[in-house]
A protein has these predicted regions:
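Polysaccharide-binding surfaces and accessory modules of carbohydrate-active proteins
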Residues: 1-147
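Aromatic-lined carbohydrate-binding/catalytic grooves of carbohydrate-active enzymes
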Residues: 216-276
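Short alpha-helical segments and helix-capping/turn motifs at coil-helix boundaries
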Residues: 36-39, 52-53, 163-168, 204-205, ...
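Residues within well-ordered beta-strands of beta-sheet-rich folds
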Residues: 42, 51-57, 180-182, 219-221, ...
Length: 276
């Protein structure tokens, strides 16, 4: 697509925001009867990462369900991790269907959601890549390797949809005069685990945690023991145990202990649920 664009413009400005002080570089590509492609790069003093986003802009309006703020060229051969046990962190989109975080050999192709890390387990050096804005898009990370230790494809894309996101339809299209991807985090770290901590702080800079000045809720979830065997009678037994053994032994918060009824609660009647 970039080959159809004939004009390029690069701008820069000093910035100061929640991430610190730095520079924003903007690359704008334009062409006749084409929406402008605007990519911004945010670089901050003292940070081992940069942020970037990409946008399509047209006064007549644009719509898309797919953007790639970071993507390698098709013939990429990257061995930045060096020799060793090179691996990929796979992050699930949610916690449904018993899905887990896991580490995979850097071979073939893998998909992660919202964030991933490609790292050398022997040296701990690695790349962390992920979206730090989560209000509009579902994003994915695609990593491929056709040779041990070599990254042949690395991209973060918006519009992730499929079994991993529990979707059966394509991602919805985002419309407007300007459609922008989420800001994307990319950094190389001596220890990829420190990079993941930095990624978390970057997310919290954009969307700070909500304040909570009260106690920590104390409770029990039924799945750990009962799984699908949850029943009205079992819930009452647990409630009695809480009252007789926990609440009077300081296993509580302000005198309250919660019961989280997981899979199986729908088998109870409305009357039983109201009684509980």
């Amino acid at each position: 697509v970039s080959g159809t664009y004939t004009e390029y413009e690069i701008g820069q400005e000093e910035i100061t925001d929640g991430f610190g002080t730095g520079m924003c570089f903007t690359v704008t590509r334009s062409g006749e009867n084409l929406p402008s492609v605007i990519q911004r790069f945010f670089l901050y003093e003292g940070k081992d990462y940069f942020l970037t986003d990409v946008a399509l802009s047209d006064e007549k309006g644009v719509e898309t369900n797919y953007l790639r703020p970071i993507s390698t060229e098709p013939d990429t051969r990257c061995d930045i991790l060096g020799k060793g046990d090179n691996r990929v962190l796979i992050v699930p989109f949610d916690n449904d269907k018993w899905v887990r975080y896991r580490s995979s050999d850097l071979r073939g192709g893998v998909n992660s959601f919202e964030v991933s890390a490609v790292y050398n387990a022997d040296t701990r050096r690695g790349i962390v890549i992920g979206s730090v804005e989560h209000d509009t898009w579902k994003s994915g990370v695609r990593i491929e390797s056709d040779e041990p230790g070599i990254i042949s494809r690395l991209e973060l894309y918006t519009g992730a949809s499929g079994e991993g996101t529990r979707d059966v339809l394509p991602h919805g299209k985002v419309k407007g005069k300007t459609v922008r991807s989420p800001k994307t985090f990319f950094g190389y770290f001596e220890d990829w685990r420190d990079g993941m901590e930095e990624f978390g702080r970057a997310c919290a800079t954009i969307a700070p945690p909500l304040p909570w000045n009260l106690g920590t809720p104390f409770g029990w979830n039924s799945w750990a023991k009962m799984e699908f065997r949850l029943s009205y009678e079992k819930v009452l037994e647990v409630s009695d145990f809480f009252k007789e053994n926990l609440q009077n032994n300081n296993f509580e918060n302000n005198g309250i202990v919660y019961i989280g009824m997981d899979a199986g609660w729908a088998k109870m009647s409305d009357e039983q649920l109201a009684d509980i």
